[in-house]
């Protein structure tokens, strides 16, 4: 009897040691992560089979037994996962219980138009294309903003998403992010800023975004536009003309383009255009509501990304001749 008990004891110790070893043994042997998709309603046994089918080097029954013994088998969450090299049965279960799905990223770039945003979303083959057949107006209605122009309404940032996420869901996140940023910027506006509403701040910020080549000039550029708004001067900013031309713009802005009237042409129409012309980032939003204190009414690109600012038309014309026409003073 003693000998039998001794053998039982040895077997228990051995099985316990084997289980402990297995729980810490990597499930994958390759360098590339395994892709695992768990559909809603999949049973724990089905999850174990899916893990093995994805390429894990283990036994499905053994993995299922581990799920059951852990007491967490019913807490496994559906989703799209990546099982990286070195993942053990223990760390796998922790990942599945926490719902740590594999996340991809999409960057919406400062200065992009809504059209460019849609093009970027359409290129993402891991995103569900729920808006592909919708017009811009229909998209805004789906987002709860019927009648609101989509331009500039989405905050440029890098967004993480799980495989199979809806493009509409990502747009909703970007929309709400811009809501928060715009609200914060408007609350921090200077007391003398010549803007009547957050919408006007968003419009001006979009212009500042498109006009700024060097970050250090941003507040100064906003200051020029603020000064022009205060005294009733035309803003005369090329990016608004380009936006108004739409697909007619061929990359070369001509004098006749400046004279072609559109709702966005700030050479032919006073004040701000009716909508933003692009997505402004946080810095452009803050510059629009906290413009630099300056006497400048003009600026011209110097060719190195920076701008030259002038207080008079004569000075501005000399700067244009110098920096854009290559004429000496």
Where are the language model's segments positioned?
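N-terminal type II signal-anchor transmembrane helix
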Residues: 1-33
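Short low-complexity stretches enriched in small and charged residues
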Residues: 2-6, 33, 74-75, 112-115, ...
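N-terminal hydrophobic or amphipathic segments with adjacent small-residue motifs
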Residues: 8-10, 35, 105, 299
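Short hydrophobic/aromatic-rich motifs at helix boundaries and adjacent loops
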Residues: 16-21, 63-66, 86-92, 176, ...
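Bacterial extracytoplasmic/cell-wall-associated proteins, especially those involved in peptidoglycan
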Residues: 43, 119-128, 141-329
